[in-house]
């Protein structure tokens, strides 16, 4: 569970209830400068330079310094990757002939290799992304392993049915792989989003062309090496680093791609959907932005609600699509909640992500850094009350002070738009009917949460809120077994759980004439 991560970096009395075996286990000391082994394009189980020979820098967000140059894939490289994937998916190929149980064993093997290299991958993730190393190790890598192993178990268990149709006929269904799956992953959880995409696609027998985020390409590329080591046939997984308008657009519009799965902003999701529809009507799964309401009722456990609301917003430097970024607090506990939330934000440790005491590292890059500061300025200009933070937290790197706004109104920019940073907005409400209307008055619908001791209130709100996930008295609790996805402009389709397999299969009906049917 994500919430367990907090205990590793901050073990005060109020967090005692969060302690778990994962959080108390020893975390190996990291290498602060892990060597980069993979920075090219991975096609057909081989490493390639870009056709154009272009490269781009990937930057350490803690310092602003370049880590290394990475091959910059574009349309020509995507064409090569799709060609390799289509060859791997041909009838009679080793991948198509492989038993489903063997596909599962390959996924188990991949998870084992990632676990073997867990310390290295966690350090590389922290170097390239900026998230605290203990979070990379205890949370991200733990969830990667659980996701891959969960879908490995599904490989030979997701199947069709026999159907008793009328007449002398025998009818059954097959769950067949869609084919070539384009997958475009974001920079906020590079390894985890790679696992969310690869797990169900490979378990069901598909082949993959993946574009990794230009801000954080290094860990996903290293996993490509492990995919080859695990024994996946050439062409089954191909990984192209590059930029959205070139490599990403080429995947979304490619006639040889049968499905595209994208995690990222709603704005880019629109472009993906249009490109998919105007090309070959490929299937689309979108996990997009959010402005999730976190509702604190007056009867909530105040200690727990304050800590969880802090976690809901500030976890991962606020760079979560499902962040609890609209904190609605019932009026008779509003002042106390605000006071305690400000105190908690002021105590949040911001700094070197390799330091085990650090709770918050830098934002991912300069673009995000400047965008977040712009939202903070907007909040001040529109009349929200800046209660703490509001500026840069270091002389170099992309660190931002934990920021809290009070007296936030629904019409303010910071209450409507996804900030994607460590900026908490606290809003006041009176009645449960009022907060339902205000919480649902958003173009987004990814997640929501309710804190209350009253089960009737919790049940009512969980049904009334327009969100794909509703947490009750907790936040950011994920499991590979539970589906995740959004309502409205937060996306379409579901990832994780059994539901996550549906997007990667076609259901084929086969009907056979028989001489005589007997029950």
UniProtKB/Swiss-Prot annotation:
Residues 1-19 form a transit peptide. The keyword NAD applies. The record marks 188 as: Transition state stabilizer. Pathway: Alcohol metabolism; ethanol degradation; acetate from ethanol: step 2/2. The gene is Aldh2. One of its GO terms (molecular function) is aldehyde dehydrogenase (NAD+) activity. It is found in: Mitochondrion matrix. It comes from Mus musculus. The lineage of its organism: Eukaryota, Metazoa, Chordata, Craniata, Vertebrata. It is an enzyme of class 1 (oxidoreductase). CDD domains: ALDH_F1AB_F2_RALDH1 (cd07141). The active site is at 287 (proton acceptor), 321 (nucleophile). NAD(+) binds at residues 264-269. In response to mitochondrial stress, the precursor protein is ubiquitinated by the SIFI complex in the cytoplasm before mitochondrial import, leading to its degradation. Within the SIFI complex, UBR4 initiates ubiquitin chain that are further elongated or branched by KCMF1. Gene3D superfamilies: Aldehyde Dehydrogenase, Chain A, domain 1, Aldehyde Dehydrogenase, Chain A, domain 2. One of its GO terms (biological process) is nitroglycerin metabolic process. A motif (SIFI-degron) lies at residues 12-26. Keywords: Acetylation, Mitochondrion, NAD, Oxidoreductase, Transit peptide, Ubl conjugation. Homotetramer. This is Aldehyde dehydrogenase, mitochondrial. Its EC number is 1.2.1.3.
